């Protein structure tokens, strides 16, 4: 591990024996830098611009080389605002890619894309750093075992189970509960698996990032008294940051997660909220770098950029990175190139439905649209598979009958269909669950439901043993015993 030139002691002069260039052109967040002949920096090298603006304020901007243009010029993308920069300013080639602090020192802290702490809690130990650009693990290092990653959330574990070391997409428009679901998962993983999480906030609202941090402190995921006991490291490149920062902050978070996996040999959860913003930042920069746009104005390198991030998220023989990525779907159009490219990399999809959120069923996970490659009898077992299929069939039949019910009413249905509808409505409500992180809003304590309990509960509903209970008894409860207890009080 090398000393990090971008975050090391600012008192040390970095100009000695360094490759010096000068700014030749500035186009928004993109800089052209001229270097002496034969002294061109490598692609992805970090460049640092230091100087003073017209008001005498100090400027310190880090950039990343993207293209070698010829005529001894390189084109670089700035990781922070370029206000105050002017032509002719000195630029230092650091000789290495951006490097960020990794290891236990990162837990409980908030970082920016450069690995600098932004939480006003003092400096971070930067003796152990790692470059953000790496190749994916070799095939021989990969772990091919298939195992389920239990989340304690009924609808997820039963109908679209997550794979340990897999990639999961959380799909949904604005305001259907993606961020709350992510927070619940961080909470459950910390408590049930004792694992660490890394949260990458890519191009989302700063307010939400702040709320998440405050709620993590309240729920104990971040331990203020002893930061080393915290379960999560946070890396933010929010909406107000330049596209360079939003484009690379996902890699910064991933680099921190890789260290926990490869060196500490831990199981890690990597959250990316939102992967769409990673693509969006790439498309903002792409045109300025002089690339021809492709479909819908996205960058022509869309699938390559996505692949270079996603292929590093995997399980090795040492540990695993399970990644949960919120995917904003522009205008709810799943065929848009950004979500469509993301789909290719995912093992499971959790689709959030506005219709369920409107009914007050939270988490608003759509049981019919959510999918998982893990839902196979040879992986999850015959009992789990059969229960999940029966639940889906019951809900699908209810969906088909809804038009008839809306026009003619329940009375026109056959006895069998009426029973199916009654059970489907119970299942729909039983798929809801009180969350630990939502206790503050709902007042009801959160529930973690193990997979065996979940399967037992749905089997009882499907068998007809609970047909006599009112459907309200199944709403926002944990396991099936709580539903029967609630029914006696109704």
UniProtKB/Swiss-Prot annotation:
Organism, as annotated: Aethionema grandiflorum
Family: Belongs to the ATPase alpha/beta chains family.
Catalytic function, reaction form: ATP + H2O + 4 H(+)(in) = ADP + phosphate + 5 H(+)(out)
Keyword Chloroplast: yes
Membrane topology per record: Peripheral membrane protein
EC identifiers of the protein: 7.1.2.2
GO molecular function: ATP binding; ATP hydrolysis activity; proton-transporting ATP synthase activity, rotational mechanism
Modified residues (Phosphoserine): 13
Protein name per Swiss-Prot or TrEMBL: ATP synthase subunit beta, chloroplastic
Residue sites binding ATP per the record: 172-179
GO-annotated cellular components: chloroplast thylakoid membrane; mitochondrion; proton-transporting ATP synthase complex
Organism ancestry: Eukaryota, Viridiplantae, Streptophyta, Embryophyta, Tracheophyta
Keywords (A to Z) from UniProt: ATP synthesis, ATP-binding, CF(1), Chloroplast, Hydrogen ion transport, Ion transport, Membrane, Nucleotide-binding, Phosphoprotein, Plastid, Thylakoid, Translocase, Transport
Sites of Phosphothreonine modification: 6
A Pfam short name: ATP-synt_ab
CDD domains per the UniProt record, alphabetical: ATP-synt_F1_beta_C (cd18110), ATP-synt_F1_beta_N (cd18115), F1-ATPase_beta_CD (cd01133)
PROSITE patterns in the record: ATPASE_ALPHA_BETA
Major location (coarse): plastid
Subunit relationships: F-type ATPases have 2 components, CF(1) - the catalytic core - and CF(0) - the membrane proton channel. CF(1) has five subunits: alpha(3), beta(3), gamma(1), delta(1), epsilon(1). CF(0) has four main subunits: a(1), b(1), b'(1) and c(9-12).
Swiss-Prot/TrEMBL GO biological process terms: proton motive force-driven mitochondrial ATP synthesis
Task of the protein: Produces ATP from ADP in the presence of a proton gradient across the membrane. The catalytic sites are hosted primarily by the beta subunits.
Cell location: Plastid, Chloroplast thylakoid membrane
InterPro entries linked: AAA+_ATPase, ATP-synt_VA_C, ATP_synth_F1_bsu, ATPase_a/bsu_AS, ATPase_alpha/beta_chains, ATPase_F1/V1/A1_a/bsu_N, ATPase_F1/V1/A1_a/bsu_N_sf, ATPase_F1/V1/A1_a/bsu_nucl-bd
